[in-house]
């Protein structure tokens, strides 16, 4: 059992050996996750290449459909799935194995339930696009693409929770291997459907769905044959339908936070359409968003790594190590931001040539790329900070920060600089810079004022281990039975999640200054 750290231990900087040890621990998770992210990015590029092969109309329709799917579906599924991350991370640190399996099952049910109304929305996509004033021909092509993408919602509802389930147990390399195999198969699948069978844009959509299905089947096979599931396996039962309050309390604000950031970039594209020469500005914005998506792979992987580390350490009652994880990851994030800024500045005249030869688009891209690099100087620390907040089960703070930074600061600045100050395309990116800067500053303020002893107390409320290791998980305990067991120090994480959330809520109100009392 870990001894409680003294006050000095929680306020000192880590030694060089501690920092190197933590870098190694984070790198063990973030390294394979980065490779996986790059592989999945290349898969998206392959799909875009095949859309371009089909023609300008198919490329426009497919791009519009993917943007619509991101806003209304993929961002929601991804955000809700991340709600299970702090529960699984802290459960793994506290050796509450069975809760891992239960949380996996509950999250799958949550995502499958969410996919149903999203599917109905996608079925009516053409009507929605026409109501928004989109071109009839492009809307028809986009509608065809998204109809064949509907099964992807259900496969992602299985895939996202499975990936988080493995990552919170520090199992990341198998995901990289499985992603590599699925991406390698993605090219021949596209060739078979698009070129050989001449299925057109429907073939590209089916290929994307097929690739996600392959990835899920490969990961499921690994989980089964490696027996990684045995300690956490819980037979599906009605217990999956209980204890949803804590999962939803984490999933909903995480989803809001993810959606707010994803939607901002779609909003930027809409604003580009209002500028002079919208074709050039929209094309340049597309190039820059693809570039920032590529750069984002690295801070995103770091964020996922530190989220797992912080959750594991808090669950294991080691607040000092959780704090070291935060410090080391933020230093790494600043280094990533500086590297991104240097890259975009040096490559501002060459990078756009990989995508186009149009002089006007190249000029706009060269002007905005250094600003995009400055944005990454704020984006990398704030993305990493979001990982720390997720690992310590405080996603509502992240949602509040994103709302305030992107929509109360960034949006007005973008409109002011782009249209009122007549700075045009560069002015829109200055709005994003203002959003990222304010987001990073608020995130750093919250993290620097975190009381790690209080955070470990919050985690302990979820991770009180039973006095007897053989005690079965009391999933069906009544409220009175739960209170009795807690008084005898036999409560565990599942009791707290299923029966009573009040201890966790009361502590979160004391330590989360940006949480509104209505959402906590």
What role is predicted for each listed range?
Residues 45-48, 59-119, 159-167, 284-348, ...:
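Small-residue-rich hydrophobic transmembrane alpha-helices
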Residues 28-47, 148, 211-215, 219, ...:
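Transmembrane helical elements of multi-pass membrane transporters/channels
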Residues 2-10, 24-85, 252-272:
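Signature of the first transmembrane helix
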Residues 45-49, 120, 127, 161-165, ...:
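Alpha-helical transmembrane segments of multipass membrane proteins
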Residues 41-60, 129-133, 192-199, 255, ...:
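Helix-terminus/linker motif at the lipid-water interface of multi-pass membrane proteins
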Residues 35, 39, 43, 72, ...:
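Residue-level hotspots within pore-lining transmembrane alpha-helices
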Residues 1-33, 88-155, 173, 182-252, ...:
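Short alpha-helical transmembrane segments in multi-pass integral membrane proteins
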Residues 56-63, 67, 142, 146, ...:
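Small-residue hotspots at the loop-to-helix junctions and early N-terminal turns
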């Amino acid at each position: 059992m870990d001894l409680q750290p003294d006050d000095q231990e929680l306020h000192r900087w880590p030694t060089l050996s501690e920092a190197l040890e933590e870098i190694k621990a984070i790198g063990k998770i973030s390294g394979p996750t980065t490779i996986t992210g790059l592989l999945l990015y290349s898969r998206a590029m392959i799909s875009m290449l095949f859309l371009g092969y089909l023609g300008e109309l198919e490329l426009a329709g497919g791009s519009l459909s993917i943007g619509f799917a991101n806003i209304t579906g993929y961002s929601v599924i991804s955000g809700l799935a991340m709600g299970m991350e702090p529960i699984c991370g802290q459960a793994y640190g506290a050796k509450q194995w069975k809760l891992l399996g239960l949380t996996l099952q509950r999250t799958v049910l949550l995502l499958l339930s969410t996919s149903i109304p999203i599917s109905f929305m996608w079925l009516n996509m053409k009507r929605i696009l026409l109501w928004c004033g989109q071109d009839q021909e492009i809307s028809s092509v986009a509608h065809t693409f998204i109809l064949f993408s509907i099964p992807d919602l259900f496969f992602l509802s299985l895939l996202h929770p499975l990936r988080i389930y493995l990552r919170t147990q520090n199992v990341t390399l198998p995901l990289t291997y499985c992603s590599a195999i699925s991406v390698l198969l993605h090219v021949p699948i596209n060739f078979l459907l698009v070129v050989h069978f001449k299925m057109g844009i429907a073939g590209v959509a089916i290929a994307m769905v097929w690739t996600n299905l392959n990835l899920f089947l490969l990961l499921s096979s690994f989980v089964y044959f490696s027996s990684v599931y045995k300690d956490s396996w819980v037979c599906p039962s009605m217990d999956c339908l209980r204890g949803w309050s804590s999962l939803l309390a984490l999933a909903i604000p995480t989803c809001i936070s993810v959606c707010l950031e994803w939607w901002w970039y779609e909003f930027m594209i809409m604003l580009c359409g209002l500028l002079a020469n919208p074709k050039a500005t929209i094309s340049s914005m597309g190039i820059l968003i693809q570039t920032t998506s590529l750069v984002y792979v690295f801070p995103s992987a770091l964020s996922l790594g530190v989220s797992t580390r912080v959750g594991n350490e808090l669950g294991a009652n080691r607040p000092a190590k959780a704090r070291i994880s935060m410090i080391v990851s933020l230093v790494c994030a600043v280094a990533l931001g500086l590297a991104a800024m240097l890259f975009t500045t040096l490559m501002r005249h060459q990078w756009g040539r990989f995508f186009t030869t149009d002089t006007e688009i190249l000029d706009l891209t060269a002007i905005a790329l250094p600003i995009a690099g400055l944005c990454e100087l704020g984006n990398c620390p704030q993305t990493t900070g979001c990982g720390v907040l997720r690992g310590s089960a405080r996603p509502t703070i992240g949602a509040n920060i994103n709302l305030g930074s992107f929509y109360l600061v960034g949006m007005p600045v973008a409109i002011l600089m782009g249209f009122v100050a007549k700075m045009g395309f560069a002015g829109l990116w200055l709005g994003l810079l203002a959003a990222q800067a304010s987001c990073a500053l608020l995130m750093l303020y919250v993290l620097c004022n975190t009381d790690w002893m209080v955070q470990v107390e919050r985690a302990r409320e979820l991770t009180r281990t039973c006095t007897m290791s053989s005690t079965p998980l009391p999933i069906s305990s009544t409220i009175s039975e739960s209170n009795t067991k807690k008084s005898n120090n036999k409560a565990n994480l599942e009791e707290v999640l299923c029966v009573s959330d009040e201890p966790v809520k009361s502590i979160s109100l004391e330590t989360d200054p940006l949480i509104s009392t209505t959402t906590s």
